[in-house]
Amino acid sequence: MKRPFVRIAATATAMAVAVLLGGCSTSTTTTGTAGVAPPKVAELKKLGAGEGQLNIIAWAGYAEDGSNDKTVDWVHPFEQQTGCKVNVKIGNTSDEMVQLMRTGQYDGVSASGDATLRLIYAGDVAPVNTALVPNYSTISSFLKKRPWNSVNGQMYGIPHGWGANVLMYNPKVVTGAPTSWGAVFEGSSAYKGKVTAYDSPIYIADAALYLMKTKPSLKIKDPYSLTETQLTAAVALLKQQNANVGEYWADYTKEVQAFESGSSVIGTTWQVIANVIGADKKVQVKTVLPKEGATGWSDTWMVSSKAKHPNCMYEWMNTITSAKVNAQVAEWFGEAPAQTKACSQTSDTGFCTTYHALDSAYASNIHYWTTPQKQCVDGSGNDCTAYSEWVNKWQQIKG
């Protein structure tokens, strides 16, 4: 694949959230979300003939038809194989995707973890009958029945791809090889003006994760379930960091340019960004998953509860998670494929090693994006802070 598409400011806008959730955890060691039952929506019991059309909402790069690069096309082969004409609406943020799904005009969506539970509890998506998606059987087990894609053991989608928000640094400037997020929080003054961070309220979770591991007295159990006291501590840490941040980034090209120009030397990143910088060969960078773990994303293909073309949507979910196509998508987009067999199909033989695609131990250290709720998503009570509060705090942090 010639160039990656990556999400840009996927969570940078405020989310209008009014969902009552039961207990759940963002840790990959928890099996599914348990608690308040979502609205009853019937799942498809058996596949029928394709309806001839498919309307989906997707991140840029998830449904390529050759228009961006004529060699990158899995939409047309799908149409030829199934007879389902694909119409794609590009979603720019999770918030936008949620609103589009609520119109009932689409058959499915590639939802990130900060959107999935909202869609489930609003009754906008249907449970998925995984028996009707043959390729589901070889999806990485650590992505199945997770808090962001299932409720009480029932899958609400098919895992597509995932990635971590890792630490990147310039080894010729940064002294030693950092192993902790402390390098950009408590130790950031050493690189004053050259520290960078993700520009979104959800970045508060990164600070919360660091405090969860280093300040046990705060009793943080989940970086997305913060009481007022815990949120205050995370905000204080980020205000301290802000004094040393040269610039925040949401567009990946901005971070590439910052590292290549030398205006940034350390900060949070995506692996694909490090790969782009490495390919440009203007400056050397290294990445590490710090000892505290990291935040990250896991995307899921979900079926609308109002789908007019459910059979075509099921055909799409099976095709997009086939070994060949999932490999194509992963390399083009810049993320780990969900399909275990995809690793034998990548054009870059080292791709899955670079993205830790089959490394369950690595994946277990990722706390995937989840929208903060007043009712704590870790099941600890109803005294947590909602995302709207995070938005306000983020504005204060940046001044």
Region spans (language model):
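C-terminal motif of bacterial Sec signal peptides marking the signal peptidase cleavage site
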Residues: V19-G23
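Bacterial lipoprotein signal-peptidase II cleavage site
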Residues: C24-A34
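Extracytoplasmic ligand-binding site segments that recognize negatively charged/polar headgroups
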Residues: N55-K70, Q105, S110-E260
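Periplasmic-binding protein-like
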Residues: S137, V235-Q241, Q271, K281-M302
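A bilobed periplasmic-binding-protein/Venus flytrap-type ligand-binding module shared by bacterial periplasmic
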Residues: M168-V173, L209-L211, W297-H309, Q328-W332
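Mature extracytoplasmic/periplasmic domains
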Residues: V303-Y368
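Conserved C-terminal helix/tail region of periplasmic/extracytoplasmic solute-binding proteins
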Residues: S364-G399
